[in-house]
Amino acid sequence: MIRCFAWTPLVGAPLITTVHFTSPPSLRIFASRSSAPSSSSSSSSTVAAASRRSISLSIIAVTSSVVSSFCFSSPALADFSEIPNSGGVKALDLRIGDGDVPIEGDQIEIHYYGRLAAKQGWRFDSTYDHKDSNGEAVPFTFVLGSSKVIPGIETAVRSMKVGGIRRVVIPPSQGYQNTSQEPLPPNFFDRQRLFTTIFNPTRLANGEGSTLGTLVFDIELVSTRRLHR
């Protein structure tokens, strides 16, 4: 089984491409029948073995070619930099902003696109889907330093400028620690799927805690406003 996922850079609401191979691509191989009779069963076995090797190599070649074309179409993890003193949050700036840098206590507005790595990049929420009465996307608002949101998002925006877009990989320790931390998907079934994956007791007992809650967020810093002068 081969699974890969590639994410496109954020332009408005970014797209996600997921590719699954539950079995290798099927190949049909035609062989001409020899007019001469087989000399021995040993010869037949040799030909059969060679055919099997040929099929295996062909499958590997085709599979590798297809996977390469999809899996490496997005920025590699090596392109990310770990944010200092972040607990392991890795960031890649897709666009550098030209506005203010937020400070503690500011009211922040962001657009985001959140995915869960343990579900092959399943998108669990996006503010681009949250519309007001005019059909405009409604940004997510919070106060920096209030501990209202998961630590990884606060860490990400602290070093951004307004107008910037940043992709961050958030390890479980900087992600959801309970089901009340924001941002929360407004859809009940999305919330349920998100938290039953992250806090799955069986998988946690199997030692998967270091990966289950890994999140990938594309964050656009829309605005920052000083609440206290």
From Swiss-Prot:
Catalytic activity, reaction form: [protein]-peptidylproline (omega=180) = [protein]-peptidylproline (omega=0)
User: Which InterPro entries does UniProt cross-reference here?
Assistant: FKBP17-1-like, PPIase_dom_sf, PPIase_FKBP_dom
Keyword annotations of the record = Chloroplast, Isomerase, Plastid, Rotamase, Thylakoid, Transit peptide
GO MF terms here are: peptidyl-prolyl cis-trans isomerase activity
Ranges for the PPIase FKBP-type domain? Answer: 105-225
Q: Which PROSITE patterns does the UniProt record give?
A: FKBP_PPIASE
Keyword Plastid in record:
yes
* Recorded GO CC terms: chloroplast thylakoid lumen
State where the transit peptide lies: 1-63
* Cellular compartments annotated: Plastid, Chloroplast thylakoid lumen
One Pfam entry name: FKBP_C
E.C. number: 5.2.1.8
Q: Known PANTHER family for this protein? A: PEPTIDYL-PROLYL CIS-TRANS ISOMERASE FKBP17-1, CHLOROPLASTIC
Name the job this protein performs: PPIases accelerate the folding of proteins. It catalyzes the cis-trans isomerization of proline imidic peptide bonds in oligopeptides.
- Family to which this protein belongs: Belongs to the FKBP-type PPIase family.
**What is the protein named?**
Peptidyl-prolyl cis-trans isomerase FKBP17-1, chloroplastic
